[in-house]
Regions:
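Structural motif
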Residues: 61-79, 115-120, 154-161, 204-212, ...
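Acidic, serine/threonine- and glycine-rich low-complexity intrinsically disordered segments
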Residues: 182-187, 192-296, 310-321, 325-328, ...
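Blade-level signature of beta-propeller repeat domains, shared across WD40, Kelch, NHL, RCC1
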Residues: 357-359, 365-398
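Repeated scaffold domains used in trafficking and secretory/extracellular systems
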Residues: 94-105, 133-143, 174-193, 225-235, ...
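Short beta-strand elements that form the blades of beta-propeller/WD-repeat-like
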Residues: 48-68, 102-113, 145-152, 194-203, ...
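Sec-dependent bacterial lipoprotein signal peptides
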Residues: 1-16
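A short beta-strand motif characteristic of beta-propeller blades
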Residues: 86-91, 125-130, 166-179, 217-222, ...
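Bacterial Sec-dependent N-terminal signal peptides
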Residues: 16-49
Length: 398
């Protein structure tokens, strides 16, 4: 599966304690238990030699974590499940936010900030710390060490580091993208060969500009004034959605495809995803009749969600492509597939985009219950209840 960077605008920084609403941004809540699978398009490709890993934050029984994650009396844990069996638990400390812990390469990594420093740990043991309070937007484990891309919590600027050592530092600007993207193990980072890519927004004499960075150098730049709406780096190629005077285009390595905006419609937001050897744009358009969603590839394929449905995430793995459908509060209702199939939800919400994964044609959803409803792991429409007081934060297949 390709890692990618999708530009949707600035991600809100994670806080050590989270009060109502539970997490920054729109919660992805759901309510209807007992959903069932209604399509027959699941691939039979086995996950040979691979295991399913879930991360979750667990609070003491009876504690109302959905109202306040700070005023807890008792231990809070980050749990790791392998194939539905709990295999590891570490104290959560200040890392309860889903952006502040991740499972990668057989290890559970956490980060948190003191009043002056940022600390990165593995299995609860400190790996390194560095001066400055940073929200980690990109995280990779490579042969040369742990790569982090941190947004300054106390102001503008960001830093690219390896094991805490600075490779690139900007005193202004912001990282775009982050750990909430489905299937993007590196968060705001994207790998291609020996290179690491990421996208940032920096001020310039021409106003703000989007920069595609390759390692510690600027690789490509787009001024905001030219209408750039979204940027993707995948497979070493740079793609973007761009507004022009009378059209909206998807540009891949300089080649433009006109996107299917209707007469009188404008683009509210857009998102880019790599799919097979193509690039897919999800567009939310606004017209006189209200909002409309559509998906279109650079190769010209177009997919139209059902009228009135809200699309929140795009899932792809090179074999299949689908999109999550949510209601007005962000409740997960179903996943629709590009071939016309449907997988119904079984109740629960996605705390993070990393709670949804498409791998080898199989759909995995780590769904957190609301108002006492059970937490559920759903694989290809079949769910398993997990009776703990807390929330899922990711699903990974390795």
């Amino acid at each position: 599966m390709r890692n990618s960077i999708a530009l949707l605008g600035l991600a809100l920084l994670a806080a050590a304690c989270i009060r109502d609403p539970l997490f920054p941004g729109t919660p992805r809540y759901s309510h209807e238990p007992g959903g069932r699978r209604t399509d027959s398009t699941t691939t039979d490709a086995p996950l040979a030699g691979e295991h399913i890993y879930l991360t979750a934050v667990r609070f003491p029984d009876g504690y109302a974590w959905d109202l306040d994650t700070c005023a807890v009396d008792g231990e809070v844990w980050i749990d790791l499940y392998r194939d539905s069996e709990k295999v590891r638990s570490i104290p959560a400390g200040a890392s309860v936010h889903p952006d502040m812990h991740r499972y990668l390469g057989g290890h559970l990594y956490t980060d948190w900030s003191t009043d002056t420093e940022t600390v990165v740990s593995r299995e609860g043991a400190e790996l390194f710390r560095f001066e400055g309070r940073e929200a980690i937007r990109g995280f990779l484990v490579r042969e040369d060490g742990v790569h982090t891309l941190g947004q300054d919590r106390d102001g503008n600027g960001f830093t690219y580091r390896i094991d805490g050592r600075i490779l690139y530092r900007s005193e202004t600007g912001a990282v775009l993208g982050g750990p909430d993207t489905p299937g993007a193990a590196g968060g705001a980072f994207s790998e291609y060969g020996e290179d690491v890519f990421y996208v940032c927004c920096l001020p310039s004499e021409r106003g703000k500009e989007y920069h595609v960075m390759r390692n510690a150098e600027r690789h490509q730049s787009f001024p905001i004034s030219d209408g750039t709406r979204a940027v993707l780096v995948a497979g070493g190629k740079v793609s973007r959605v761009r507004s022009k005077p009378r059209s909206l285009v998807l540009e891949v390595d300089g080649k433009e495809t006109r996107l299917a905006l209707g007469g009188g419609e404008s683009c509210l937001w857009s998102q880019l995803t790599a799919w097979e050897e193509d690039v897919l744009a999800l567009v939310c358009a606004q017209g006189s009749g209200g909002k409309r969603f559509f998906l279109q590839t650079a190769g010209g394929k177009t997919f139209s969600p059902m009228p009135g449905e809200t699309v929140s995430e795009v899932l792809s793995d090179g074999q299949r492509m689908g999109w999550t459908v949510t209601d007005g509060r962000g409740d997960l209702l179903r996943v629709r597939w590009s071939d016309g199939g449907v997988t119904e939800g079984t109740g629960g919400f996605l705390v993070s985009g990393r709670c949804a994964l498409l791998r080898n044609g199989h759909l995995f959803l780590a769904l957190t219950g609301r108002a006492g409803a059970p937490n559920r792991f759903q694989e290809d429409g079949v769910h398993t209840d997990f009776p703990f007081n807390g929330y899922f934060t990711s699903v990974t297949v390795e």
